């Protein structure tokens, strides 16, 4: 399968490149970066033995290289437009960029179905994180009092994380609506109680040294339950990325969430 990587100079994109190179059934055919200085990836010392073109224009790459799939790990402000461009060129997409609205996901799904091509957008590609979300969804049925704390490196641009939003969406499907906190509570500092989604509070932490972490804290009379997942290294996401690339061959629609392709 011929794979191109968009955002290859980012931390996740860099790890994706190394993963594609390790997989025998996947071939790295192009990489993309915003205003690249290089014309070929071999100009980067780490990849000096390779011969893979570097592009700065997504449409140009799609038309010249015609990859089977593009893996996109860029930034929220271009994630939607990149994915739309990829799908409109009838190319499969695996997207780890976050910040999509429900309306954007719906539109992209319609494009994928009209082209009969597979695509996947996932807030998190770590299998452990997917299990964490599923466990939280099940627990929310019995513990409606819940708050989410997500912790990431301080270069992350969006808050809350896509994983936190997806977790809240999944819990809302099983959870009785409860507006978390006292009815007359007052924030002495604006934002102290975090963001709100369907009555649940979501808190975002950004610190150097972190990668990606989340805990879902449930409370009830006389007891508490905490479900936590930690990614200490970006390698934790790569098995999910490789699985998703292969899975797009079997799909004729866009799937949102890695949990929807796991057996």
From Swiss-Prot:
It is an enzyme of class 1 (oxidoreductase). GO terms for molecular function: 4-hydroxy-tetrahydrodipicolinate reductase; NAD binding; NADP binding; oxidoreductase activity, acting on CH or CH2 groups, NAD or NADP as acceptor. Its main location: cytoplasm. It holds the Pfam family DapB_N. PROSITE patterns: DAPB. One of its GO terms (cellular component) is cytosol. (S)-2,3,4,5-tetrahydrodipicolinate binds at residues 153, 162-163. It is found in: Cytoplasm. It catalyses: (S)-2,3,4,5-tetrahydrodipicolinate + NAD(+) + H2O = (2S,4S)-4-hydroxy-2,3,4,5-tetrahydrodipicolinate + NADH + H(+); (S)-2,3,4,5-tetrahydrodipicolinate + NADP(+) + H2O = (2S,4S)-4-hydroxy-2,3,4,5-tetrahydrodipicolinate + NADPH + H(+). NCBIfam families: dapB (TIGR00036). Belongs to the DapB family. This is 4-hydroxy-tetrahydrodipicolinate reductase. The gene is dapB.
